[in-house]
Amino acid sequence: MQLTIKALVGILTTISAATAVSFDMENLGAEKRGVSGEELHMLHGNEVLARFANGVYPEVANGTRVSKRAGGAEVDLTSVGGGTAWAVKAKIGSNEEEVTMLLDSGYEHALVAADSDYSPGKSSSNENTGEKFFAGFLTGGGNEGTIHLDDLSVGGLKASKFAFGYTKNRDFSSNQKLGGILGMSLPGHVDYVPGFKNHGWGGFIQTLKNQGVIDEAMYQMTLKGDGGKLSIGEVDDSQYEGDLETLMNTGKAYGHCGFKGTLNGEKHNFLLDSGTTGIAGSYDSVKKFLQGMSGVELVEEDKRGSVTGKVDCDSMPSFKISVDGKFDVKLSDDVMKKYDLGNGKCLLPIYGYTNMPKSYSYNWIVGGAFMREVSVVCKFDSNEMQIARQ
């Protein structure tokens, strides 16, 4: 998710002030070590803030399997942090060095860490453009370096002389298993990385299309709690039930796939973001939504400028999203009860923030909590998107 410079400055200020709570999703490893539901909720909430500075998630498991067909490819995804983010393997450079990258549907470009398995000096196809870049991901400290051009492939689909940021900073993760970020957002949205924009260097999917590797700039993302599938340049009909519904992509101006719908009857425009854990909107809009729900106690934090809800775990309300009136999706019980406080109370997977612009009173971000229930087809050269139940 990207915003204007003005909006980002305010958000980065909040993020920088909140560094006492680590944004590093290596702390999701702490989920396995017995971190409380309250701490986990705060970590995930801080990631929502970090998304507005292009936040990502470290901690990576095993490799991915690839199925390549003419005109496209399908890749198995690795679930990260208990189904809150998803990773894929990429091969970079003339030696095809393998780097594990997090899929980020809210960021257009790619980032490769200097301490990953990729070494520019060992790749005969590498070119250091000398063009500087800066990308703030987690604390606001930032990742900076130079933009490199080299071959990058996923699932056997190679983008030649692909532009990515090469950085010695690790403001996106201290986890050595994660070597980069692979942006998947649509082109043309607000872009505050001028080094890429000034030269017309686009993201991975658009580059594949421009170079004739795929016929259509598109991907299908099917996320699951224990993995998932990414299809590039094609659609895998086995990944969904029933029919794919074709809808107007109301998130295109934001670089997302998005649709109009309702959450428990309240109208919103939903922006799909694989890098966000739950649901996020502006402070006032989320507060009003929660106040309208029976049995919900508001939890407000002035320091972070955040609001969420606390409920009895045994009387958990339902979150039902209507997808443009075509079908309904109910968030799963494991998602709704993920933030168990251990005293019979649970925090809800929804966040409101004062630093989110007014447009996010109507535009709400929906992440993995919703996307785990659907299969989404995002088309770059169309004003439409497609979606179906898994």
UniProtKB/Swiss-Prot annotation:
Disulfide bond among keywords: yes
GO cellular component, one term: extracellular region
Alphabetized CDD domains for the sequence: pepsin_like
The keyword Glycoprotein is assigned to this record: yes
GO biological process: proteolysis
Subcellular localization: Secreted
Signal peptide residues on this chain, from the entry's feature table: 1-20
Cystine connections: 313-346
Top-level taxonomic group: Eukaryota
Major location (coarse): secreted
Key words of the record: Disulfide bond, Glycoprotein, Secreted, Signal
Maturation propeptide residues: 21-69
Induction of its expression: Expressed on human skin of healthy people and patients afflicted by atopic dermatitis or seborrheic dermatitis.
Domain Peptidase A1, residue spans: 86-388
Alphabetical list of Gene3D superfamilies matching this protein: Acid Proteases (2.40.70.10)
PROSITE patterns: PEPTIDASE_A1 (PS51767)
Glycosylation site positions: 62
Catalytic center residues: 104, 273
Chain's role: Probable inactive secreted aspartyl protease. May promote an inflammatory immune response in the host when the host skin barrier is breached. Has no detectable protease activity in vitro on fluorogenic substrates, a peptide library, or with the general protease substrate casein. The presence of the enzyme also does not affect the activity of the secreted aspartyl protease SAP1.
Family recorded in the similarity comment: Belongs to the peptidase A1 family.
Protein's recorded name: Probable inactive secreted aspartyl protease
Lineage, opening ranks: Eukaryota, Fungi, Dikarya, Basidiomycota, Ustilaginomycotina
